[in-house]
Regions:
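NAD(P)+-binding Rossmann beta1-loop-alpha1 motif at the extreme N-terminus of oxidoreductases
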Residues: 2-71, 132
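Acidic/polar active-site rim loop that often engages polyanionic ligands
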Residues: 43-44, 53, 169-179, 288
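Rossmann-like dinucleotide-binding cores of NAD(P)H-dependent redox enzymes
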Residues: 53-88, 178-189, 211-215, 229-235
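Rossmann-fold dinucleotide-binding core
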Residues: 138-225, 230-233
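NAD(P)-dependent Rossmann-like dehydrogenase/reductase catalytic/cofactor-binding core
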Residues: 2-23, 197-208, 220-226, 230, ...
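Rossmann-like NAD(P)-binding element
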Residues: 53-60, 70-78, 83-139, 145-146
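Amphipathic alpha-helical segments at domain termini/boundaries
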Residues: 14, 39, 90-110, 196-200, ...
Length: 327
């Protein structure tokens, strides 16, 4: 009965506000991810406001977007300089910047967050914007590891909240993970899927449907769609952690494990190379959050070697040393 009642409530709440096509987008966070998403959205004809509390970061991001577009022009408009200049001008006209999120979300169709990977900060942001955003506005997070359900809990628009996980560098990577919670309305989820496709991306759905699983497992798996790490990171991070454990147990050197996965599985990078690229601090942060959520899961157990390297501030390529040393 509780499950049925919940579905009825969901149906009422989601039908109260019909989601039209997403045309106006507010992106919170002027870092590399936020700027990349802004570039792709503007290139595909969306009106974009890029928001950050630091105006210098915004200016740097806008300059970075223009520089990225110039590289595109060199390839696509090599023999048509006027057309290339027109292309850049048209895309940049779709982008504006602001340091005040509250002043720009009143008429936006989508608020997409790409800020620091901290649950309380994300909750605080969305909780504040929920009070001033338009009723039809969809909220979405670009989190790579935090549960969308937890982030959405700070708002009153649970049916209009989802996840859009892009991959870096955004202009080049085709994949977008579209995440729905047990409260996300189908209309909202469909709007996020359509938006991803409008960006020229290939979306994968991280939202389970009751028709996809046996009836007797529905209650058990009702939150499967919001599993830690969604699809890519949920598979990738345990893979990298098991590589570390394999090395810790003395079953293979990091060099041999990397070579084995590149030549045997066809991966472009081995797990240790990938860890150094992602950042060991980032990997540890993700694992710590997962362990807290699911402490008995053997796939999510910590690694002494990883913890030691992070404690020594050896985060990988960005610090010059991780599992490998970099000049």
């Amino acid at each position: 009965m509780a499950f049925f009642t919940h579905q009825v409530i969901r149906g009422l709440s989601s039908s109260a506000v019909r989601n039209a096509a997403i045309k106006h987008v507010t992106i919170i966070g002027g870092g590399q991810m936020g700027a990349g998403i802004a570039q792709v959205a503007a290139t595909t004809g969306h009106s974009v406001v890029l928001v950050d509390t630091n105006e210098e970061i915004l200016k740097k991001s806008a300059k970075g977007i223009e520089g990225s577009l110039k590289r595109v022009v060199k390839k696509k408009f090599a023999d048509k300089p006027d057309a290339g200049a027109e292309f850049i001008a048209k895309v940049m006209a779709n982008v504006s910047i602001s340091t005040d999120a509250a002043s720009v979300v009143g008429s936006t169709d989508l608020v997409l967050e790409a800020i620091v990977e901290n649950l309380k900060i994300k909750q605080g942001l969305f909780g504040a914007l929920d009070k001033v955003a338009a009723a039809h506005t969809i909220f979405a997070s670009n989190t790579s590891s935090l549960p969308i359900t937890d982030i959405a809990s700070s708002t009153s628009r649970l049916d209009r909240f989802g996840g859009l996980h892009f991959f870096n560098p955004v202009p080049m990577m085709k994949l977008v993970e579209v995440i729905g919670t047990s409260a996300t309305s189908q209309e909202t989820f469909d709007s996020l899927l359509a938006f991803s496709k409008a960006l020229g991306k290939t979306p994968v759905s991280c939202k389970v449907r009751s028709s996809d699983i046996p009836y007797y497992t529905i209650l058990r798996y009702v939150h499967l769609q919001d599993t830690p790490g969604f699809i890519v990171n949920r598979l990738l991070v345990p893979y990298m952690m098991e590589a570390i454990r394999l090395h810790e147990r003395g079953h293979g050197s990091k060099e041999d494990i990397d070579i084995a996965m590149k030549l045997g599985a066809g991966y472009p990078m081995g797990p240790f190379e990938l860890l150094d690229y992602v950042g060991l601090d980032t990997a540890k942060f993700i694992m710590d959050g997962w362990v807290e959520k699911d402490p008995d899961n053997p796939l999510m157990q910590p690694s002494e070697m990883l913890n030691k390297l992070v404690a020594e501030c050896k985060f990988g390529k960005k610090t010059g040393e991780g599992f490998y040393k970099y000049k």
